[in-house]
UniProtKB/Swiss-Prot annotation:
Transmembrane segments: none annotated. It holds the Pfam family Mur_ligase. It is found in: Cytoplasm. PANTHER family: UDP-N-ACETYLMURAMATE--L-ALANINE LIGASE (PTHR43445:SF3), UDP-N-ACETYLMURAMATE--L-ALANINE LIGASE-RELATED (PTHR43445). Its main location: cytoplasm. InterPro entries: Mur-like_cat_sf (IPR036565), Mur_ligase_C (IPR004101), Mur_ligase_C_dom_sf (IPR036615), Mur_ligase_cen (IPR013221), Mur_ligase_N (IPR000713), MurCDEF_pg_biosynth (IPR050061), UDP-N-AcMur_Ala_ligase_MurC (IPR005758). One of its GO terms (cellular component) is cytoplasm. Belongs to the MurCDEF family. This is UDP-N-acetylmuramate--L-alanine ligase. It comes from Dictyoglomus turgidum (strain DSM 6724 / Z-1310). GO terms for biological process: cell division; cell wall organization; peptidoglycan biosynthetic process; regulation of cell shape. GO terms for molecular function: ATP binding; UDP-N-acetylmuramate-L-alanine ligase activity. Cell wall formation. Pathway: Cell wall biogenesis; peptidoglycan biosynthesis. The gene is murC.
Amino acid sequence: MLNAKRIHFIGIAGTGMSALAYICVERGYEVSGSDIQENISTIRLKSKGVKIYKGHNPENVNNVDLVVISSAIPPDNEEYVYAKERNIPILHRSDLLADLTKEKKSIIVGGAHGKTTTTSMIALVLENNKIDPTILVGGELEDIGGNAKLGNGEYLVAEGDESDGSILKLDPYILVITNIDNDHLDYYKSLEKIKDTFLKVIEKVPKGGFAVLNLDCENVRDIIRKIKNKEYYTYGFSNADFKADNIVLNLSGSEFDVYFRNEKLGRVKLRVPGKHNILNSLSAIAVSKILGLDFETTTKALERFQGVQRRIQLKGIIEDDILVFDDYGHHPTEIKATLETLRLYNRRLVVVFQPHRYTRTYFLSKEIAEALSLGDVIILTEIYSAGEKPIPGVSSKNIYDEIREKYPNLEVYLVDNIIEAASKAKSILKKGDLLLTLGAGNVWKVGEALLARGRKDANLEYSQ
């Protein structure tokens, strides 16, 4: 795979980076990595013999043959600068993943939302059908004990990252597109350019391979009209090749009949809630069916699937029967899907939302406010920058002002940081409420603090 023995990952705690590091370890490379934080992924890598450095230091990249970076690593990172000055080869993580996708028949999942859940479902289906795939997923998948697995089979299952266009580097044998939305506009500038990118990825699917496309997404339908000489299948709730019907939604999941071109394949049960997860499962069923895998084995795998961390995850219950949920959603479409699903509980919905990135807040503050209006009480904390530089005039107050103007009856609070958010949540929660921490940053710490010590005596003096 690589002409190197010792590989160093800058930012190894990231989901994509830690998964690649794990695969490299399993393939016999000597791996090290650095990050400003540790998490469950770095703990797992340590147990595999990976040297993890806390913080960044040029000394960390001494005596390595290759440095791997992601788009989150700034050009002035001291390890990155040191490697460049000494001509140590530097590889972007997308190029490393691209190398892997060339070695196997790769199933790549792309789209604005639902990538991690869909990738996990497909991986679990292949695992249960004894395909033994290599897996790289953007979350913790209990069945493989983490976010990566090196398999001996001919297939690889992974997420494709469209945020910076790097999905175009991958070579999918099977391509799943969950949806297309107006995200990452700081990079693409327009929705049309996003659609063009996905169309180009479809064009890379080789003869014998195929695409699986969400027909319920208008933007996906737009690119379907432009597909030429490629095999593809659609899924959705309407006139798709793979269709869900006779749907029953409940708090613990859903049930539905699945049809392939009007032929009933059978009834499916899911243990993850929400109509969006029905769509995710349909794409996994489509991949399974077209590959000729056993339908009953596939549906049993999907019924066992309990989700991945930070996707409508029930973290626990605190005093006064208050449910604590956490979700990674940060785009308006994701926020809406999560809140609509949690509305099934018929409880007062208290949402602690941490906006993700200044650029996304700049482009989508109105849409975020509209999505959050599905809650009963909203607590807005500071923007999680994800390494971005601040934009003058852009803050959580943009969303706050939108809510106050458009939804004057909605109870909304603006706080400066995570500690204040936890304190505010503690003070306003009532018996029988549902608390949701929402965002791609560290907002989950609010729920953790309340769960650790109880609502009334929570010690909120934890690090941010």
